């Protein structure tokens, strides 16, 4: 059994033998950093491991896992991961040589045998190298396929992890959100007054004993007002907070959909782009078969003639071209896979960072939810959940305006029930128990007296027993403690009768018949429960009355055999039902497990679909068999002719000649068979093309049928259009009739128009007369107009002066606004400087108009971490001052056409808006009379300055802190020197460095060769072997203690393994050893 580790960033996998023998999770991570990533990671804390179900790895059950997936945490936060991805890519990179085209020139008659044989042999060497390169490329293609599959699997696993993480937080948020939503839906802080008025309008209810109750008097009106105000202040804030969290969660869910879509796009792209890679195995097989054929034919070219060698040369030229084309195709597929893998690594890293951002958003949501969980709050501050609980209490108090009749009914029913229960308990159960127990004691006393009379006299003779046996029995004292008024206290109403409860239920039903008709029904059910409770107490009292009667177990078994059988049947039925429920539970658990996301692993299918070499061999065998069959027939004919005409010498010569012809024909048939083999390849290609054409033909026929169906549908549409056109023709005919009718009406209209013209001419004459009269009036008005113009000139001069004054006032107002903004910028800058120094400008407690500079711990570090701009300050004072500048947001529009209105606007702004707000703004910005200053010293003149006083005080605090830190530094340096001197006298056992004190011991080399070697002195160590002393001490010494002067690192390689000068200690290849130069320390 092995544990497989998958790298999410390059698809690399490794296996570890189980059980895992690491003692801690940290050591297991360090192993991954060391062996799996080759120290691309510098810290084991950056290792992030997940299981195949998207869960964090639990080291306690790691031996039960089969696969874990490794992620580099740095890629989740690094915005420029190119260098890290490059390091991971080099782990899986393998140098595959690019295609080298064949150097075999086309055949020409000028080539001699020597040139052709030399070219063919060099071409054979090229084909062998192509075969080797193709095998390497095919192996790399398979590796890339597995690695890309692992990377896709890791993307899905990370998505499952983020989905699970967000869903858990979302579920907890939903519980809180539903609770808050119910509060917002059922709030009564706006409508409680109407319900209170309805409650106050109810009449008093009078009990049977004469006592009356008015329900509205039980509520405190001031408390109701305070509750509504509290809910109004705080409920909207809580709802806004949860709406913001809900928007964040919706955004996260949308981002999850986007991530899932991007992963699916990458999968579709890989499927579409690498659908043709399935034929890579056939390419490799073709390359092998072609290369093998070239190498096989090269062995026979030494004995070949010039003509046969030319045919082989021509054949090798064509084969080399095919071999080169197939290797180029294989190399291009490899290049595409490499490029897609790099693209997938970059896109996957971007998706990992996106997942990390979603996780941080949900962590913020979780932190916000923790504020509403009272179990996770510390300190004495009131948590947000306590505020919600208080809102709920206030809402419950407001709900009493509706539910008080029902609650009061429940209360009086419970009072009566407790009264009856107490009555039965005290007078019935307790008194009966006392009587029955006393009867039992009396029976025991009588039994003991009878027994003592019969047996006791004999036993009294024995010395070991007392002469007088004790006849005392335990005493009995059953009393009732506490009364029945403790629970309700002052709310207790004495002498509540069942008639009162029945009357109250009818009273509630008659009043609340419209809004709360179910109140009376609920009260009736509760009243029935009271009756059941009292009847149960009656049964208990009756059962207590039979305590003194005794029934033996035998009689019970005899009396109730049927009851036992029924109980056993009932128990057996329950057992069967429990078994069925357990089976259903196991089925549901299996169903849940089967619905978990299962990601398929990389396929390991490397089977060969077909073997072109075998097919080509079969074809060539058929041709050769056919040619051999023809040759056999000819030889048989030749033999028969020899038998028939063996006597004739001339015939013998003819047969010899004929035999020679048959040999030539046989050679021609063999050459023809080889040519048929070569011709079969394009024939198979044409056959596959024919199949493709046939498939295309079927598709065309299907398209033809679809087009015919489409034509039929179009014909139906045309018929429909023709019907509609005939209907349109009928409508046109009807419209023509309407046009004829309208022309008749138009003729009548023209006749009326002539009459109207005549009337208009008459009216025109009257208008001419009136026009003459108006001309006379206009002459008189023109004279009046001249007088008005003279007055207008004087007015223009005055308006010009007003316009100049208005523009000057507008400019002054603008400059005043600019100066106010500059002053506010100074305040903002001073606040920013103070916060950079750890101070904050705030309002004094209880005085909003008095300002104070106070020290705030952690403010400076937060500012440095956040890198906020100068305008982003934490002090509320600049915001309050900015709110005072409301008057500065009022723009004065100077209208050149109406300067009087502009002047009125300026006056209105300056008097109505600036008088109060501007003076208040000036008083606040001055920081003179409205500040609280803490003096630095009694005689310091800077105490009258507000900001400089705080800065000076802060600098003095920093100066005092610097002195304190300098003093602590000197103390720590002294302690460091002491520890250094102390540690320099201790022997080092691991991680040797210069100036370490080391114990060296002599060792010996185990070698079979009888030669003199240097006796090694190695450092006594723990987990740090191969540290040898450079200088050889005296042979008689058994140990030495020396201080390291220098350490030189050496590595045993294949070249220096047997060199005694470079490997004097006969170490194995690949071992790193260190030559230590040390100075002996005297005792």
Curated annotation (Swiss-Prot):
Q: Which organism is it from?
A: Meyerozyma guilliermondii (strain ATCC 6260 / CBS 566 / DSM 6381 / JCM 1539 / NBRC 10279 / NRRL Y-324) (Yeast)
| GO MF terms, alphabetically ordered | molecular adaptor activity; protein kinase binding
- Organism classification, top ranks? Eukaryota, Fungi, Dikarya, Ascomycota, Saccharomycotina
Annotated Pfam families: ATG11 (PF10377), ATG17_like (PF04108)
Give compartment(s): Preautophagosomal structure membrane; Vacuole membrane
Quick check: keyword Mitochondrion in the entry?
Answer: no
Query: Protein name, please?
Result: Autophagy-related protein 11
Predominant place of localization: membrane
Q: What does this protein do?
A: Involved in cytoplasm to vacuole transport (Cvt), pexophagy, mitophagy and nucleophagy. Recruits mitochondria for their selective degradation via autophagy (mitophagy) during starvation. Works as scaffold proteins that recruit ATG proteins to the pre-autophagosome (PAS), the site of vesicle/autophagosome formation. Required for the Cvt vesicles completion.
Q: Which GO terms describe its cellular component?
A: Atg1/ULK1 kinase complex; phagophore assembly site membrane; vacuolar membrane
- Membrane topology annotation: Peripheral membrane protein
UniProt-listed GO biological process terms: autophagosome assembly; autophagy of mitochondrion; piecemeal microautophagy of the nucleus; protein transport; reticulophagy; ribophagy
Residue spans making up a coiled coil are 562-591, 648-812, 953-988
What keywords is this UniProt entry annotated with? Autophagy, Coiled coil, Membrane, Protein transport, Transport, Vacuole
Q: Does the keyword DNA repair apply?
A: no
The UniProt similarity line reads: Belongs to the ATG11 family.
Oligomeric state and interaction partners are given as: Homodimer.
């Amino acid at each position: 059994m092995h544990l497989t580790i998958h790298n999410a960033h390059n698809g690399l996998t490794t296996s570890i033998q189980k059980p895992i023998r690491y003692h801690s999770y940290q050591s297991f991570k360090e192993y991954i950093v060391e062996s799996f990533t080759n120290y691309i990671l510098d810290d084991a804390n950056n290792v992030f491991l997940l299981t195949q179900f998207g869960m964090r790895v639990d080291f306690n059950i790691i031996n039960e896992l089969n696969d874990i997936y490794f992620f580099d945490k740095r890629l989740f936060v690094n915005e420029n991961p190119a260098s890290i991805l490059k390091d991971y890519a080099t782990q899986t990179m393998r140098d595959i040589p690019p295609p080298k085209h064949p150097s075999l020139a086309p055949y020409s008659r000028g080539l001699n045998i020597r040139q052709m044989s030399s070219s063919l042999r060099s071409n054979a060497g090229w084909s062998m190298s192509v075969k080797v390169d193709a095998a390497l490329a095919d192996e790399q293609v398979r590796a890339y396929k597995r690695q890309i599959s692992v990377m896709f699997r890791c993307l899905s696993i990370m998505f499952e992890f983020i989905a699970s993480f967000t869903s858990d937080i979302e579920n907890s948020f939903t519980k809180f959100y539903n609770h808050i939503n119910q509060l917002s839906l059922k709030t009564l802080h706006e409508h409680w007054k109407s319900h209170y008025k309805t409650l106050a309008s109810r009449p008093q209810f009078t009990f049977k004993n004469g006592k009356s109750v008015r329900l509205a008097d039980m509520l405190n009106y001031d408390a109701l007002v305070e509750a509504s105000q509290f809910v109004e202040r705080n409920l909207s804030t809580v709802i806004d907070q949860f709406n913001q969290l809900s928007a964040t969660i919706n955004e996260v869910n949308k981002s999850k959909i986007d991530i899932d879509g991007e992963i699916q796009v990458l999968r579709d792209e890989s499927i579409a782009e690498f659908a043709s890679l399935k034929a890579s195995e056939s390419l490799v097989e073709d390359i092998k078969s072609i290369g093998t054929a070239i190498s096989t034919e090269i062995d026979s070219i030494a004995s070949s003639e010039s003509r046969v060698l030319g045919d082989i040369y021509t054949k090798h030229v064509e084969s080399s071209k095919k071999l080169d084309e197939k290797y180029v195709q294989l190399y291009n597929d490899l290049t595409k896979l490499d490029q897609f893998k790099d693209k997938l690594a970059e896109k996957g890293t971007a998706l990992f960072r996106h997942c990390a951002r979603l996780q941080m958003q949900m962590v913020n949501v979780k932190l916000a939810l923790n504020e509403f969980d009272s179990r996770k709050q510390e300190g004495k501050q009131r948590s947000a959940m306590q505020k919600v609980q208080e809102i709920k209490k206030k809402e419950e108090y407001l709900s009493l305006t509706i539910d008080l009749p029902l609650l009061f009914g429940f209360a009086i029913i419970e009072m009566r029930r407790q009264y009856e229960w107490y009555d039965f308990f005290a007078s019935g159960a307790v008194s009966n128990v006392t009587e029955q127990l006393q009867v039992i004691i009396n029976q025991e006393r009588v039994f003991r007296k009878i027994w003592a009379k019969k047996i006791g006299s004999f036993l009294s003779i024995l010395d070991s027993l007392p002469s007088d046996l004790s006849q005392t029995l335990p005493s009995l004292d059953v009393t009732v403690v506490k009364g029945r008024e403790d629970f309700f206290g002052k709310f207790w109403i004495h002498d509540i009768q069942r008639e009162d409860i029945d009357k109250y239920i009818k009273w509630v039903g008659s009043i609340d018949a419209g809004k709360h008709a179910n109140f009376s029904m609920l009260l009736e059910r509760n009243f029935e429960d009271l009756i059941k409770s009292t009847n149960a107490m009656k049964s208990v009292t009756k059962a207590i009355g039979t305590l003194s009667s005794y029934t033996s177990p035998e009689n019970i078994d005899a009396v109730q055999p049927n009851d036992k059988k029924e109980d056993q049947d009932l128990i057996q039925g329950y057992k069967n039902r429990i078994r069925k429920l357990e089976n259903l539970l196991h089925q549901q658990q299996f169903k849940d497990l089967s619905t978990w996301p299962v990601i398929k692993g990389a396929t390991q299918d490397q089977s060969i679909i077909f073997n072109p070499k075998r097919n080509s061999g079969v074809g060539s065998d058929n041709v050769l068999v056919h040619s051999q069959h023809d040759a056999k027939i000819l030889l048989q004919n030749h033999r028969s002719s020899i038998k028939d005409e063996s006597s004739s010498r001339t015939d013998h010569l003819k047969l010899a000649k004929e035999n020679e012809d048959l040999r030539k024909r046989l050679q021609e048939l063999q050459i023809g068979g080889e040519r048929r083999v070569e011709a079969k390849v394009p024939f198979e290609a044409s056959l596959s093309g024919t199949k493709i054409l046939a498939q295309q033909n079927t598709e065309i026929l299907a398209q033809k049928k679809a087009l015919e169906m489409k034509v039929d549908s179009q014909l139906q549409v045309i018929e429909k259009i023709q019907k509609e056109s005939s209907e349109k023709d009928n409508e046109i005919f009807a419209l023509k009739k309407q046009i004829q009718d309208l022309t008749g009406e138009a003729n009548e209209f023209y006749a009326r128009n002539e009459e109207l013209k005549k009337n208009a001419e008459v009216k025109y004459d009257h208008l001419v007369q009136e026009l003459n009269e108006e001309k006379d009036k206009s002459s008189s008005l023109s004279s009046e107009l001249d007088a008005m113009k003279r007055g207008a000139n004087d007015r223009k001069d005055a308006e010009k002066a007003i316009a100049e004054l208005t523009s000057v006032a507008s400019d002054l107002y603008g400059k005043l606004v600019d100066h106010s903004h500059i002053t506010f910028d100074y305040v903002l800058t001073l606040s920013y400087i103070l916060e950079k120094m750890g101070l904050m400008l705030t309002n004094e407690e209880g005085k909003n108009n008095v300002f104070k500079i106070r020290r705030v711990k952690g403010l400076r570090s937060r500012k440095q971490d956040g890198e906020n701009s100068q305008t982003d300050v934490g002090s509320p004072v600049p915001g309050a001052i900015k709110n005072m500048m409301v008057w500065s947001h009022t723009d004065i529009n100077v209208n050149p056409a109406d300067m009087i209105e502009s002047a009125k606007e300026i006056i209105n702004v300056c008097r109505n808006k600036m008088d109060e707000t501007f003076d208040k703004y000036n008083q606040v910005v001055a920081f003179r009379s409205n500040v609280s200053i803490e003096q630095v010293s009694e005689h310091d003149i800077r105490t009258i300055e507000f900001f400089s006083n705080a800065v000076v005080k802060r600098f003095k605090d920093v100066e005092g802190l610097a002195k304190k830190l300098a003093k602590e530094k000197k103390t720590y340096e002294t302690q460091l020197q002491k520890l250094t001197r102390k540690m320099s006298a201790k022997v080092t056992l691991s991680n040797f460095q210069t100036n370490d004190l080391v114990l060296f011991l002599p060792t010996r080399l185990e070698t079979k060769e009888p030669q003199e070697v240097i006796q090694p002195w190695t450092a006594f160590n723990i987990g740090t072997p191969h540290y040898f002393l450079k200088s050889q001490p005296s042979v008689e010494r058994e140990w030495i203690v020396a201080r390291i002067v220098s350490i030189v690192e050496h590595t045993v390689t294949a070249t220096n393994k047997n060199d005694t000068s470079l490997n004097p200690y006969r170490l194995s290849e690949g071992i790193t050893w260190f030559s230590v130069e040390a100075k002996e320390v005297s005792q």
